[in-house]
C-alpha cells in the first residue's frame, strides 16, 4: 500500500515500533477533527492549525492524565513539522498541564508472577512472562526479536536485544525461562511451523502453524499479560495501577539483580540495557558476553520464580563451590607432597655431604 506523501514523510522520521504508536495517536486526532484524508490536515493556514492544536490540547486536558498528554501530542506535532507547517510549539507546550507524581513504579513480587503463571495454560503467555521477568527486556524488544537472536548458553539462553541497532545489548534467560521458551517452540513445531533463524521468537496467534509467522505487537503482549493479572494484588491510583502491566516485570528483574550484596552495578546495568546510569561505561565498559553471563548467573536464584528452580540453582552452586574447595584442597595436598619430597631429597643430599666430610677426617 502506497502511503500519501504527507504520511510517508511522517513515517520516515521514526522507527517501525514507534510508528505504530504515533500513527494510532495521529488517527485519533484525525477522528476528533472528523477527517479521513491526511492531506486535509494541511489545508488550513498556520493560524488555524495553531488554534486547532490548542483546542485539541484543551480537549485532552479534560479527559487524559497530565503525564500522558505529551505522548499524545508528540505524534501530531511531528506530522505538522515533517510537512513543513509552522506552529508555535513553545506557546503550545506552555499550555501543557503540570506533570503529577506518577504511580506504577512498583515491581512485581515472585508471588505476583507465580499467580500470573498459574492463571494461564497458554505456553506462549508463560514463556512471555518468564522471558520479560528474567531478561529485564522492555516490551519493545518483542516485535523485533528473532530466533536467531536467541542462543543457548549452558542451561540458560543468551538474548541479543535490538540486534543491529545502536541500542543493541546482550541479556540472558534463566533455566526456568529457557525451559518455558523451549516448550513454546516445541508447541509451534508440533503445529507444523518450520522454525528458522529469521522466525519471530514470539509470534502472533495462528490457526495453522504453517501459515507465515508474524511478530507479536506490543499491544498483543500487553493484552496477553493483562489476562493473567486478575488475582494479582494491585492498587489503583487515578488512572494507573501501582504495578504496571508489563514494565513491572522489568522492575522485578532490576530489583532481583541489584539487591545482591556482591552485585557489580556496571555489569547489571549492561544486562538491563540502560548503562546510562553509569555514564563512563557507555564508552569504556565494553564487557564480553561471557563476563556478563558470569554476573547474571549469580542472580539466577533470585530471578527464578518456582522454588524448584531456585533450589536446583542453589544445589548447582553448592556443588560448584564444593568442587572448587575440593580442587583447592587437592592442589594444596599435592603441593605439600611435593614440598615433603623436596625436603627428603635435601636431607638425603645433606647426609651425603656429611658422610663425605666424615670420611676425609
Give, region by region, the residue ranges found by the protein language model.
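Basic, Lys/Arg- and aromatic-enriched nucleic-acid-binding interface segment
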Residues: 110-139, 250
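Active-site/catalytic core of tyrosine-dependent DNA strand-transfer enzymes
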Residues: 174-240
Amino acid at each position: 500500500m502506497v502511503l500519501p506523501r504527507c504520511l510517508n514523510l511522517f513515517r520516515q522520521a521514526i522507527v517501525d515500533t514507534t510508528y505504530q504508536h504515533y500513527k494510532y495517536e495521529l488517527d485519533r486526532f484525525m477522528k476528533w477533527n472528523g477527517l479521513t484524508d491526511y492531506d486535509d490536515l494541511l489545508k488550513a493556514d498556520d493560524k488555524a492549525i495553531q488554534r486547532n492544536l490548542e483546542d485539541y490540547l484543551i480537549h485532552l486536558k479534560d479527559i487524559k492524565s497530565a503525564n500522558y498528554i505529551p505522548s499524545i501530542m508528540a505524534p501530531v506535532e511531528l506530522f505538522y513539522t515533517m510537512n513543513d507547517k509552522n506552529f508555535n510549539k513553545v506557546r503550545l507546550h506552555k499550555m501543557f498541564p503540570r506533570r503529577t507524581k506518577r504511580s506504577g513504579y512498583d515491581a512485581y513480587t515472585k508471588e505476583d508472577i507465580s499467580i500470573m503463571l498459574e492463571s494461564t495454560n497458554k505456553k506462549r503467555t508463560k514463556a512471555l512472562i518468564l522471558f520479560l521477568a528474567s531478561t529485564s527486556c522492555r516490551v519493545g524488544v518483542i516485535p523485533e526479536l528473532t530466533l536467531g537472536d536467541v542462543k543457548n548458553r549452558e542451561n540458560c539462553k543468551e538474548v541479543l536485544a535490538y540486534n543491529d541497532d545502536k541500542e543493541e545489548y546482550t541479556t540472558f534467560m534463566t533455566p526456568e525461562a529457557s525451559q518455558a521458551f523451549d516448550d513454546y517452540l516445541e508447541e509451534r513445531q508440533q503445529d507444523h511451523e518450520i522454525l528458522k533463524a529469521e522466525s519471530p521468537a514470539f509470534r502472533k496467534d495462528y490457526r495453522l502453524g504453517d501459515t507465515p509467522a508474524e511478530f507479536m505487537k506490543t499491544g498483543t503482549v500487553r493484552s496477553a499479560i493483562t489476562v493473567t493479572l486478575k488475582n494479582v494484588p494491585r492498587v489503583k491510583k487515578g488512572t494507573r495501577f501501582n504495578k504496571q502491566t508489563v514494565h513491572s516485570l522489568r522492575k522485578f528483574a532490576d530489583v532481583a539483580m541489584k539487591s545482591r550484596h556482591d552485585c557489580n552495578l556496571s555489569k547489571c546495568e549492561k544486562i538491563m540495557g540502560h548503562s546510562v546510569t553509569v555514564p563512563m561505561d557507555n564508552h569504556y565498559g565494553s564487557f564480553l558476553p561471557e563476563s556478563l553471563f558470569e554476573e547474571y548467573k549469580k542472580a539466577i536464584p533470585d530471578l527464578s520464580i518456582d522454588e524448584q528452580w531456585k533450589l536446583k540453582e542453589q544445589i548447582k552452586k553448592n556443588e560448584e563451590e564444593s568442587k572448587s574447595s575440593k580442587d583447592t584442597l587437592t592442589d594444596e595436598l599435592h603441593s605439600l607432597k611435593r614440598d615433603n619430597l623436596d625436603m627428603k631429597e635435601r636431607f638425603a643430599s645433606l647426609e651425603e655431604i656429611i658422610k663425605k666430610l666424615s670420611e676425609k677426617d
